[in-house]
A protein has these predicted regions:
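A solvent-exposed, acidic/Ser-Thr-rich amphipathic alpha-helical stretch
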Residues: 20-72
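A beta-strand edge to alpha-helix "cap/lid" segment located at domain peripheries
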Residues: 55-61, 65-140
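Soluble or luminal CAZymes and related metallo-dependent hydrolases
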Residues: 3, 7, 45, 91
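Short, mixed-charge, low-aromatic patches
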Residues: 1-10, 33-36, 52-57, 108
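Short acidic-aromatic low-complexity motifs
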Residues: 2-26
Length: 140
């Protein structure tokens, strides 16, 4: 299990468009992937999520900050940095992935947990202003 967890973490830290073909040996054919934008089942849907990432952002990079294992599940604390197309600023998102492994070491499910509102939407023009206002109104 530890080897599979480490290998999956390395895959993300070195992810590139040409590495997506390696997913066949890393994730199960019916893998489920969930994040704030996607809920897909199957290896092709999983690949499509990352193809879309490479099409829409420049210099995407995942850094695994911490890993914990509980039974067949690993938890990865990570930082994702990228540049929006045509924008010089580097954006950073931090989150946690809950990843369930099968007995053969393949990934069965990958569920991402991160706050899209505060880490992404609030940084966008117009909608960001509205969301920051709402957050201030709801805060204690």
């Amino acid at each position: 299990m530890k080897d599979a967890v480490a290998a999956y973490g390395r895959f993300f830290e070195t992810i590139a468009p040409d590495s997506l073909d390696r997913l066949d040996g890393i994730v199960a054919p019916d893998v489920r992937f969930v994040d704030p934008f996607n809920d897909v089942t199957g290896i092709e849907g999983y690949r499509a999520v990352f193809r879309h990432m490479f099409e829409t952002v420049d210099q995407p990079r995942f850094t695994i900050l911490r890993t914990a294992i509980d039974g067949d599940t690993a938890f990865y604390r990570w930082r994702f940095s990228f540049r929006r197309k045509g924008v010089a600023d580097i954006w950073t998102i931090e989150g946690m992935s809950e990843v369930r492994f099968l007995a053969n070491g393949l990934v069965a499910a990958h569920i991402d947990h991160w706050d899209a509102a505060s880490q992404l939407y609030e940084r966008l023009p117009v909608i960001g202003t509205l969301l920051r206002w709402i957050r201030r109104k709801l805060a204690v």
